[in-house]
From Swiss-Prot:
Gene3D superfamilies: Cystine-knot cytokines (2.10.90.10). Belongs to the glycoprotein hormones subunit alpha family. This is Glycoprotein hormones alpha chain. Disulfide bonds join 34-58, 37-87, 55-108, 59-110, 86-113. GO terms for cellular component: extracellular space; follicle-stimulating hormone complex.
Amino acid sequence: MFWTRYAGASILLFLMLIHLGQVYPRNDITNFGCEECKLKENNIFSKPGAPVYQCMGCCFSRAYPTPLRSKKTMLVPKNITSEATCCVAKEVKRVLVNDVKLVNHTDCHCSTCYYHKS
């Protein structure tokens, strides 16, 4: 009787895992909850007939061990080196909305994160 409970629970867990695998078949877990880098309308500054767009979304980032020869040249040696790209505007157009000068993004791409540089 004790073993049948374990077998029943194991089978139930196995069936739930199979169901989850079918519900979320080919989702990339690394981007889960974050859309690709693209233009989206800014609801705060947009008005009917004059939409304002901005770049939003995710790009890649990664971390890896710092190569020894690079570590030797660092003022403050770090064990981990990281790279990241951010969703930035490739092209922009300046617009005036309610006497406020704005930059309307017209094209987006993944590029260097400027706020990470020091």
